[in-house]
């Protein structure tokens, strides 16, 4: 059986049913090979074009649901690490364009005709309904999305918001890495994944000015509240 068949065992990880956070914006929470989990976000624009952030392998009912939302316009790989199911989803929606890091294109040149980069995407989303913001100063080629209509910020590894750890060992790890019970950047980001602190913090200050109502992270719980203050405070506490 073809490994990409919708009836095969290619969907290894479980996920929740779609949840509509706000009108025309849905999430699916999924398990992963580690305790961090993952999240797929789906945004439908006013012209019924649909963008999928961090695509996950899905069973046929959820793929049918995606198709029912409108034309699948684009698939967004949030950074160079979260691309495991991008090719699979691209096969299910062959007309969708792909927003991805340069490193992914280098490995898959046959898809170059479908690739979009952040500087080009602004011109294909009507009235900037969805903003694509590449993160400078980091080593993992992340792109953040902002949905102005709902003031929702969608990111991946720039910040985490994990629930309380269940074991003493994990609690110690969370404390060491600044990654539990608070929507914040991790120490891994600060010490290992940042290559230009000044550039990153300037970008972060611009994110804070967007003052999102919610921050949809890939790992952990969705932050609801004064997103601008949370971004400023959490980065200031960690980076100084």
Q: Which sequence ranges carry the predicted segments?
A:
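Metallo-beta-lactamase
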Residues: 2-19, 33, 51-52, 101-239, ...
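N-terminal short beta-loop-beta anion/metal-coordinating cradle
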Residues: 17-41
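Pre-active-site segment of Zn-dependent metallo-hydrolases
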Residues: 34-74
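Short His-Asn-centered micro-motif
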Residues: 53-56, 76-80, 100-102, 135, ...
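Active-site environment of divalent metal-dependent phosphoester hydrolases
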Residues: 59-60, 81-85, 105-109, 161-164, ...
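Active-site HxH/HxHxD metal-binding segment of metal-dependent hydrolases
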Residues: 63-126
């Amino acid at each position: 059986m073809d490994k990409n068949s919708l009836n095969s065992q290619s969907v290894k990880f479980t996920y929740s049913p779609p949840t509509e956070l706000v009108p025309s914006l849905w999430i699916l929470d999924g398990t992963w090979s580690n305790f961090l989990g993952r999240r797929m976000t789906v945004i439908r624009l006013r012209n019924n074009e649909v963008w999928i952030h961090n695509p996950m392998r899905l069973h046929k009912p959820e793929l049918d649901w995606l198709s029912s939302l409108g034309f699948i316009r684009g698939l967004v790989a949030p950074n160079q690490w979260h691309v495991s199911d991008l090719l699979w989803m691209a096969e299910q929606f062959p007309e969708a364009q792909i927003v991805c890091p340069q490193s992914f294109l280098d490995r898959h040149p046959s898809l170059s005709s479908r690739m979009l980069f952040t500087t080009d995407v602004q011109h294909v989303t009507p009235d900037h309904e969805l903003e694509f913001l590449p993160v400078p100063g980091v080593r993992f080629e992340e792109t953040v999305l902002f949905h102005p209509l709902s003031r929702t910020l969608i990111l991946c590894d720039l910040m985490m918001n994990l629930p309380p750890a269940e074991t003493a060992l994990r609690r110690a790890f969370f404390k060491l890495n600044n990654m539990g019970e608070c929507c914040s950047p991790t120490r891994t980001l600060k010490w290992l994944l940042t290559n230009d602190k000044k550039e990153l913090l300037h970008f972060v200050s611009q994110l804070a000015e967007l003052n999102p109502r919610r921050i949809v992270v890939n790992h952990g719980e969705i932050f609801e509240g004064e997103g601008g203050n949370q971004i400023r405070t959490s980065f200031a506490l960690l980076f100084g």
